C-alpha cells in the first residue's frame, strides 16, 4: 500500500466518523458516559478508594466508542452507576465490578451507563497501516474493524457502523 492510499484511507475514515457522529446526534441517539479511573491510594493509615472522573460522552457502537467530534476509542469496561446494596464477599471479579459500580455512583447519575478503561484510537495513516489502531485496520485501501477474536470476524467499517448505529 502506498503512502497516498493510506492517507486517503485515513481522510475517508475521519470523514466517516464525523458523518456517523452527526447522524447519531441528529437522531438524538442515546449516548453513554465516559470516565477515567483514578486508582485507589494508600498513604500511611489512610486508604482512598478508586474513583471515576467524567471524561465526556460517546455512543457505544460494538467494539468502538464514538464521540460527537468524531473521535474514536476501543471499548474497555462498562458499568452502571448504582450504589451496591450489600457486600457479598464473592469472587475477586464480582467484588471488582461492585467497586466499579460504587465508584461510578459517586460521580454519575443513578442508573447511568459508564464506560471506562477505553483506549483512544490513533486515526492517522501510519497507525492504520501498521496496525496500531487496533481494532481498526487497513485492507486493500479500505478501513475494516475487527469485531471479534476470530480471523473471519473482520468487517468493512462503513457497513459495521451502519449496522451498529441502528441499535443506538
Question: What label would you give each PLM region?
Answer:
Residues 52-104:
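Aromatic- and glycine-enriched beta-alpha-beta binding-site module
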Residues 12, 40, 49-51, 77, ...:
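Generic serine detector
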Residues 31, 35, 42, 82-84, ...:
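Generic alpha-helical propensity signal that fires on short helical segments
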Amino acid at each position: 500500500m502506498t503512502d497516498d492510499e493510506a492517507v486517503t484511507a485515513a481522510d475517508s475514515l475521519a470523514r466517516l466518523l464525523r458523518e456517523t457522529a452527526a447522524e447519531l446526534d441528529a437522531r438524538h441517539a442515546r449516548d453513554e458516559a465516559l470516565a477515567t479511573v483514578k486508582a485507589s491510594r494508600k498513604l500511611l493509615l489512610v486508604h482512598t478508594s478508586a474513583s471515576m472522573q467524567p471524561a465526556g460522552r460517546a455512543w457505544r457502537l460494538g467494539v468502538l466508542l464514538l464521540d460527537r467530534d468524531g473521535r474514536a476509542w476501543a471499548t474497555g469496561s462498562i458499568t452502571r452507576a448504582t450504589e451496591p446494596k450489600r457486600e457479598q464477599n464473592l469472587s475477586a471479579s464480582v467484588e471488582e465490578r461492585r467497586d466499579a459500580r460504587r465508584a461510578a455512583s459517586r460521580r454519575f447519575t443513578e442508573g447511568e451507563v459508564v464506560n471506562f478503561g477505553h483506549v483512544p484510537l490513533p486515526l492517522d495513516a501510519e497507525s492504520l497501516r501498521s496496525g496500531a489502531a487496533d481494532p481498526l485496520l487497513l485492507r486493500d485501501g479500505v478501513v475494516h474493524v475487527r469485531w471479534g477474536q476470530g480471523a473471519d470476524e473482520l468487517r468493512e467499517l462503513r457497513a459495521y457502523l451502519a449496522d451498529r448505529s441502528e441499535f443506538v
